[in-house]
Amino acid sequence: MTAREFLEATEKEKLAPYATRSADSAGRTLHGDEPDDYRTCFQRDRDRILYSKVFKDLQHKTQVFLINEGDFYRTRLTHTLEVAQHARTFARALRLNEDLCEAIAYAHDLGHPPFGHSGEETLNDLLKDDGGFEHNIQSLRVVDFLEKRYQRYDGLNLCFETREGIARHNTTHDHPDTPPEFQNYSQASLEAQVVNIADPLAYCAHDLEDALNAGYLRMKDLRNMENPLVRRVFERCSSRYPDFLKADTVLQSRILVRTLIEEANIAVIRQTSRNIELYGISSVEEARSLPEDVVAAPAGVWKNFDALKAYLFENVYRKPQVCIMNEKGKLIIRRIFHHLEKRPEMLPGIFKTRFDEAADSSGKRRVLADYISGMTDRYVMDLYMMMFEPYEKVMFEFRE
């Protein structure tokens, strides 16, 4: 028995009947590949994503605050790691496939362009007549086609279930159309649903901590919120830590966010366990055939969480400083896009080849979106300076 076969047997014994087992995977449907002797297929997917260049680039991509504004804010990479940690917690508690959850979590933001959601909005507007730009679908495009690590094929050649989790990543803010390939079931796997709920929980918690540390929010403003969830979190903080309100802002924010995460995680695990029992779910197929998600928080808790996110939107994301950062990012992307569209000879290597080979103007604009969305914040700002600032030096290596 190989190490992989032992791990697959362990999954069969330990995982819940509604969990996705690696031995039952639909496999690598894009390109055939021999199984590994010591890793399951989902462990292999996770490792392929972790070692990819595009994953490393997430450390230099904006979450909310531009990278060059300070090195103590979350980046797209730290966000991804926190989503994966939430997903592992849920998977372990619910006896789901932790490796699949982790792989989907690591890949869910690979298609995000520089400058966060403002960058995505700009590319979507630039491609409004060409199918638009949506970062979840772009993430699938990255792992299927754009990332280069193997001679035999483009992309990372991930398993069907990992790719489905990327394509069907669905949150309050993200509603991509499900590609036909993944429409066999009304619902995604429970592992994909876990990542779907881990994502907004993670970004709300860490955006709150970053905003408090940046001085965009004050602790007393949060204490005065008419939000039962926030009020309960403050009560728990005060009862657990008698000197909580006397601590400095940084320590207060860490205690507050840690307690908020704990409240949210407990609520999700309990509600999901109730849903599994309520529906009598005993197989993967049953979980996938339901009219609604199984992995969920209680309606009241989620309503309060949405209210907290709305509060952050009004009091952080609309701050003048953040708006200026966002508009700066939009201007940079838009100007580079239009300039490259007129002067494609400025495109490096493989992107120039793809641009020339594109069948029509729509295809050419898609190549430009692929190129720009793969840039880090720092690189796109350097490229902007190189293109438009007369005294900026241009003798540096272009990225492929």
From Swiss-Prot:
Residues 76-204 form the HD domain. GO terms for molecular function: triphosphoric monoester hydrolase activity. Keywords: Hydrolase. The keyword Transferase does not apply. CDD domains: HDc (cd00077). InterPro entries: dGTPase (IPR006261), Diverse_Catalytic_Enzymes (IPR051094), dNTPase_2 (IPR023023), HD/PDEase_dom (IPR003607), HD_domain (IPR006674), PHydrolase_assoc_dom (IPR026875). SUPFAM superfamilies: HD-domain/PDEase-like (SSF109604). It comes from the Bacteria. HAMAP family: dGTPase_type2. Belongs to the dGTPase family. Type 2 subfamily. This is Deoxyguanosinetriphosphate triphosphohydrolase-like protein.
